[in-house]
Regions:
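Secreted/periplasmic proteins
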Residues: 10-200
């Protein structure tokens, strides 16, 4: 989550350890946009990454097209707003985005809140969460749309969809994928990453 992810080489160093936020388990990246300023969209790079270690736990990033998992989701917001994400974008707490420890960045996943069956496609553009038993960290806006912002955490299902485009904002398209318990419609191609069309 908006962390300086030189984790593979720095996670075991004393210098890195001194900077780790005990609440989140990682060091925060620099804030490049202040609250109230316009947050630029896109601008990152496609990244899978090498294995890395945080707080004694090894994470192995991979491009797993069949990824589907259930676990706890949390959300992050003001503390990380305007900071660089792990793939070089800028975190916007009001965008439809998420942090995941191993999935490619940027990519799309559908997140379903198992308590109310709301689901939403979000953009994974950061690494995390690294605290407790959390599986994915959603932006403030994503947690609000999925109905668990006030609770702080929710049990969710995460399903990988595919790569996300590097440039521009996809927020409007992603908000349109919100489902309130009804099945998602047949996929429609709305973006492209390289030569591969992405269906949302």
């Amino acid at each position: 989550m908006a962390a300086a992810l030189a984790l593979a080489s720095c996670a075991s160093s004393d210098k890195f350890a001194r900077k780790v936020d005990p609440k989140y388990g990682v060091a925060s990246s620099p804030r490049v946009v202040e609250m109230g300023e316009r947050v630029p969209k896109g601008g990152g790079v496609y990244r899978v990454g090498k294995p890395y270690v945080v707080s004694g736990r090894t994470y192995i990033p991979e491009e797993n097209t069949s990824y589907r998992s259930e676990g706890l989701a949390s959300w992050y917001g003001r503390d990380f707003h305007g900071r660089l994400t792990a793939n070089g974008e800028v975190f916007d707490m009001e965008s439809i985005s998420a942090a995941h420890p191993t999935l490619p960045m940027p990519s799309y996943v559908r997140v379903t809140n198992l308590a109310n069956q709301r689901s939403l496609i979000v953009r994974v553009n950061d690494r995390g969460p690294f605290h407790g038993n959390r599986m994915i960290d959603l932006s403030h806006k994503s947690a609000q749309l999925l109905g668990f912002k006030d609770n702080g955490v929710a049990r969710v299902r995460v399903e990988y969809i595919g790569r996300a485009a590097l440039e521009g904002s996809d927020d409007r398209r992603l908000v349109a994928t919100l489902r309130h318990g009804e099945p998602a419609p047949a996929p429609v191609v709305v973006a492209a990453a390289g030569n591969a069309p992405i269906a949302l």
